[in-house]
Amino acid sequence: ISILAALFDEVVEVLLIDEPEVSLHPQLQSYLLREMKSAAKRYNKTIIISTHSAEMIELNSASELCNFVFFRKDSLPKQISPDTPELNSVKLKEFLLRMSLIYSEGFFAKKVMLIEGSSDMILCRYLCNRLNLKLDVAGSQIIPVEGKGQFPVITKLFRLIGKEVCVLTDLDGFTDDNNIKFIINNNTVIIINPITIKIEY
């Protein structure tokens, strides 16, 4: 209530809010985010929030990526310049309009593994449990994409915001879509075939 009161107080010009999502369920977090955006526009307020909630990530355009500042313990804060050429990518703009919550969770990770779908997620969960790998504690996020054709644009997005990207794909990902091949240059690509698991760097 105190946050909402400050949002609509015309005397308050600048708000610094630490973790506004505390004690709020996801639906109320979404509501609060909408109210913050509305108040910022209506009353010309400057609102800065610190958050660990994926519900607080909402992008309607590529230029809104410039409003985010990403912090890591071992590096300088990362913020995208409005002049960044990648922001003009049509595919990136289209993806951001339909970006779901699972991708937003990757904004808080140090490393992101992109996988093709549910079968790969089952494999990853099995290996993590079998090998006792605590990827979440290590700051890693596994994200299933909507088909291998989405790998390039999603990789581009996470590179822009300073994330390390790893891709898990079948061999047909390279024979069916040549656009995927560019990922190899700067990322780890894990290729799965029916016989072995091969890791290429």
Predicted segments, located by residue:
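Non-catalytic alpha-helical coupling and interface elements of nucleotide-dependent molecular machines
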Residues: K41, K73, N129-L133, T188
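Activity-critical C-terminal alpha-helical subdomain
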Residues: F174-Y201
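Conserved helicase/translocase motor-coupling segment
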Residues: A109-I184
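Short, low-complexity, polar/charged sequence segments that are solvent-exposed and flexible
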Residues: R34-E35, N67-V69, N88-S89, L133-K134, ...
